[in-house]
Amino acid sequence: MHTFDFKNRTAVVTGGAQGFGLDVAKRFLESGAKVFIWDIDEKLLKSAVDEVKNPNLFYSVVDISNYQDVEKNVADITSKSNIDILINNAGITGPTGPLWEYDVDMWNKIVQINLMGTFNCCRAIVPNMIKNNYGRIVNVASVAGKDGNANASAYSSGKAGAIGLTKALGKELADKDIAV
């Protein structure tokens, strides 16, 4: 497997307690990075740290849909280190069903996590990347955001918004050494 050199780099991986997010975190650790995994589920976070057993893996319980929570955790990290890499992986699919029957509170929750969570993390972390003239951001989306999935309008809409946010942010940062 190809290895990368991320020594002296710090990554934040949202939704990093399990699945794809944890796999990404492990890969960064193998490449020498310091990694902070964020998730809403402390039990899963502790389990991930116990499984990985790497002194460069740290965790925080973070609700990415809450900007103040994100901002506080970013400040905690940046008081000791730069944040060089952001992997916005956290997301939820929610229940399926036709739009006209969809629970409004659930719709808002899905969009709040899948779109606003991505915005909140970028909004809080990008200034640190600009200050340090370096950053890499990956916003995990879905083909559902491009094509739309029947009976998954909230998920499709949130991911479509995340795709648009990614394109816009990439253009805003095009003149800096920050790739989105």
Language model features with spans:
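Canonical Rossmann dinucleotide-binding motif of NAD(H)/NADP(H)-dependent dehydrogenases/reductases
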Residues: F4-F36
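The beta1-alpha1 cofactor-binding region of Rossmann-like NAD(H)/NADP(H)-dependent oxidoreductases
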Residues: E42-K43, S60-K72, V104
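Substrate-binding pocket helix/loop in short-chain dehydrogenase/reductase
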Residues: G97-L99, M106-N108
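Active-site loop immediately N-terminal to the catalytic Tyr-X3-Lys motif
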Residues: W100, D147-S153, D175-K176
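Active-site helix of classical SDR
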Residues: C122, G158, T166
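Alpha-helical segment proximal to the catalytic Tyr-Lys
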Residues: P127, K171-D175
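Residue(s) in the substrate-gating loop at a strand-loop-helix junction
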Residues: S142
